[in-house]
Amino acid sequence: MSPERFAVKLRALRKRRKMTQATLAKKAGVSRAYLSRLEMGLHDPPLSRLRKLAKALRVAVAELLS
């Protein structure tokens, strides 16, 4: 999946959960700035971060990547 498509998916899942970037970042153990860059499609996160984001969003990693 391209970083741009991942960005759209991540933002949509975060908003569906009614979470701010700051809230999701804290739950996932990443900085808000890093999360912002992910949502802009500027980074391609490693699997370890995908797992943390998925857990914080209460979804499977596969859903983040679909």
Where are these regions (language model features)?
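Short basic helix-loop element that most often maps to the first helix and adjoining turn
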Residues: 8-27, 52
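Conserved amphipathic alpha-helical interaction elements at protein-protein interfaces in regulatory
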Residues: 12, 16, 44, 56-59
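Conserved hydrophobic/aromatic packing and binding residues within compact polymer-binding modules
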Residues: 10, 24-25, 35-38, 64
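A detector for short, charged/polar N-terminal pre-domain segments
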Residues: 1-5
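Short, conserved catalytic or interaction motifs in soluble domains
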Residues: 40, 59, 66
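DNA major-groove recognition helix of helix-turn-helix/homeodomain DNA-binding modules
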Residues: 29, 48-63
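Short alpha-helical elements of helix-turn-helix
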Residues: 6-8, 32, 47-50
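Recognition helix of helix-turn-helix/homeodomain-like DNA-binding domains
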Residues: 30-44
